UniProtKB/Swiss-Prot annotation:
Species, as recorded: Staphylococcus aureus (strain Newman)
Localization in the cell: Cytoplasm
Name recorded for this polypeptide: Ribosomal RNA small subunit methyltransferase H
Function: Specifically methylates the N4 position of cytidine in position 1402 (C1402) of 16S rRNA.
GO biological process annotation, one example: rRNA base methylation
E.C. code: 2.1.1.199
Pfam families listed in its UniProt record: Methyltransf_5 (PF01795)
Length: 311
């Protein structure tokens, strides 16, 4: 059974300015905390489209949302398919979309999913259990150069080369099959002094592998750009991120659409084509409250950004 504490639950939904008869999309259903809070504000004409690529999360959410099932459409899919999902449902535009990015607590807490560096499990890390690529495949078969690239780019790991070398040396002897086996190898690649600083030594490599397995950053970029086109004027998009890579990407996309195209010189009136598509509701990201942190230590790195559609 999933037990998941939603981060910044009220803020994420309240910033959407919920209309009681509106249509909303939850792109990351997870433990359904945000979904339940939103559904409690909708009347019988309101509707929620709830997306998750993890079928276990959807099965659990049906129980959590059992009093609201007549207003929820569950979709087992990657949120990068937003446009197609709405097309299949014959919906043109919605009133708001929200994302709660990162791994949900239950995925971390179920050892056999392979996300956690605290429990021994096979190297899996797939959000969608039907996809083929796993962490095992990356760790054992990707080249040294590819490993260095993902550890550095997705994990911001400064010892990427040393760790990739240790992985290479170990897998030449025999395949690396479990999470704790990988943790020990990562520790070998990090100098003893550095291992004692900055949290768990495997944290950054595990984050990098998870992002690579699930193609998280490019999926999010695809999705958020579609979301901007699928929300009605005055509708809003809320995004909670959990690490700097996601937050930077979200900020850059919102900034780009807020600027609009460059206006040619000498135009007496600025045509609508050159006006911004959206405005950022909060210039600086909203962070978790002390109350959030008391409930859920994973909220410490959470940042919320909100944009409102202008045209």
């Amino acid at each position: 059974m999933f037990h998941h504490i939603s981060v910044m639950l009220n803020e994420t939904i309240d910033y959407l300015n919920v209309k009681e008869n509106g249509v909303y999309i939850d792109c990351t259903l997870g433990g359904a905390g945000h979904a339940l809070y939103l559904l409690n504000q909708l009347n019988d004409d309101g509707r929620l489209i709830a997306i998750d690529q993890d079928q276990t999360a959807i099965d659990n959410a049906k129980e959590v949302l059992k009093d609201h099932l007549h207003r929820v459409t569950f979709v087992h899919s990657n949120f990068r398919e937003l446009t197609q999902i709405l097309k299949d449902l014959n919906i043109e535009k919605v009133d708001g979309i929200y994302y709660d990015l990162g791994v949900s607590s239950p995925q971390l807490d179920i050892p056999e999913r392979g996300f956690s560096y605290h429990h021994d499990a096979t190297l899996d890390m797939r959000m969608d259990q039907t996809q083929e690529l796993t962490a095992y495949e990356i760790v054992n078969n990707w080249s040294y150069e590819a490993l260095v690239k993902i550890f550095y780019r997705y994990g911001e790991e400064k010892f990427s080369k040393q760790i990739a070398r240790r992985i290479e040396a170990h897998r030449e002897q025999q395949p690396i099959t479990t999470t704790l086996e990988l943790v020990d190898i990562i520790k070998e690649g990090i100098p003893a002094k550095a291992r004692r600083k900055g949290g768990h030594p495997a944290k950054r490599v595990f984050q990098a592998l998870r992002i690579a397995v699930n193609d998280e950053l490019s999926a999010f970029e695809d999705s958020i750009e579609q979301a901007i086109e699928l929300v009605k004027v005055d509708g809003r998009i809320s995004v909670i991120t959990f690490h700097s890579l996601e937050d930077r990407l979200c900020k850059q996309v919102f900034q780009e659409y807020e600027k609009g195209p460059e206006v040619p010189r000498g135009l007496p009136v600025i045509p609508e084509a050159y006006t911004p598509k959206l405005k950022r509701v909060n210039r600086k990201p909203i962070t978790a409250t002390e109350e959030d942190l008391d409930d859920n230590n994973r909220a410490r790195s959470a940042k919320l950004r909100v944009a409102e559609i202008l045209k």
